[in-house]
Amino acid sequence: MTTPLTLENISQAPKALLHDHLDGGLRPSTVLELAGQYGYDDLPADDVDELATFFRTAAHSGSLVRYLEPFAHTVGVMQTAEALHRVAFECVEDLAGDNVVYAEVRFAPELHIEGGMGLDAVVDAVLAGFADGEKAAASAGRTITVRCLVTAMRHAARSREIAELAIRFRDRGVVGFDIAGAEAGYPPTRHLDAFEYMRGNNARFTIHAGEAFGLPSIHEAIAFCGADRLGHGVRIVDDITVAPDGQVKLGRLAAILRDKRIPLELCPSSNVQTGAVASIAEHPFDLLARTRFRVTVNTDNRLMSDTSMSQEMLRLVEAFGYGWSDLARFTINAMKSSFIPFDERLALIDDVIKPRYAVLAG
């Protein structure tokens, strides 16, 4: 018998997560405790519930710029090795609790050196937190693999340095590189040197593109930068037309994105909150899925968006009527698109994801 698609049941399904920001996923209680421990005095509230409400309200601003402002507070309490280790450990713990079996969690090392740490020490602390979190999850009966993407800020000028950091740590848990931050005025082509360095070292990278800015950002990310994946990429819908009879026509950019199987790291709730789309029901996720783009489901920022992978999946189920086979396909899409070796991807798909979804589907 098919298992009902409730939040409780969806939480039991295995999940693969490609787009999750470490500094966007802290527990409100941890933000408060770290602020007190390290003397960070700029928090807008000193109560856990009030602080959670602050982050949630800011997320629902309808603006990417406003959505990003509260990160000053999470980054502000992540300036020591101990704090970074704790946040990374709890990230793994929370994801494992939601039955995420594979995750690539990204963060920008350059934002965590205000306390005097070097970039290498920052990455060391995060990777140690991930490793210890994996061990603790396994001891609790929840196996999870977490890998890291190091991110450069697109408005800054350290992208080549961060790309070199990715290569230095490529055998220790860093599987790729990313650029993030406000898109408008900061095109991905400002960082060609970093992307060329990654390609020259046979390394993988994703680019935040097509979230708050339109098709030119996606075009540059694909045509000039050579992105392996797109962070968000939701504005590709601007290159797709749907006729009154339902026939879908792809523009040249949309067609190459689909035909090359370039994965889209879609983050439905975040896209609504930043104003990229009006509602989950109006999100182009379903159009892209039906048109056979390689779509994946992601959280973006679990604290700011007050979300989880299970909640993101449930919202899509409620909006578009998806079944277990659809959720399995989106999960397999993500696993296929991950930056770990092929045999590791295949093992998780064949040994974990497919069997567990088969049980849920009945």
Swiss-Prot record:
Catalytic activity: adenosine + H2O + H(+) = inosine + NH4(+); 2'-deoxyadenosine + H2O + H(+) = 2'-deoxyinosine + NH4(+)
Record flagged with keyword Zinc: yes
Catalytic center residues: 211
One Gene Ontology term of the molecular function aspect: 2'-deoxyadenosine deaminase activity
Bound cofactor: record note: Binds 1 zinc ion per subunit.
Record InterPro entries: A_deaminase, A_deaminase_dom, Ado/ade_deaminase, Metal_Hydrolase
Record: residues binding substrate: 21, 23, 181
Classification via Pfam families: A_deaminase (PF00962)
Disulfide bonds: none
Essential cofactor(s): Zn(2+)
GO biological process: adenosine catabolic process; hypoxanthine salvage; inosine biosynthetic process; nucleotide metabolic process; purine ribonucleoside monophosphate biosynthetic process
Entry keyword set: Hydrolase, Metal-binding, Nucleotide metabolism, Zinc
EC number from the UniProt entry: 3.5.4.4
Chain positions recorded as Zn(2+) binding sites: 19, 21, 208, 300
Residues in the signal sequence: none
Superkingdom to which the source organism belongs: Bacteria
Site (Important for catalytic activity): 232
GO cellular component, one term: cytosol
PANTHER family recorded: ADENOSINE DEAMINASE
Family recorded in the similarity comment: Belongs to the metallo-dependent hydrolases superfamily. Adenosine and AMP deaminases family. Adenosine deaminase subfamily.
Task performed by this protein: Catalyzes the hydrolytic deamination of adenosine and 2-deoxyadenosine.
Protein known as: Adenosine deaminase
Organism in which the protein naturally occurs: Mycobacterium sp. (strain KMS)
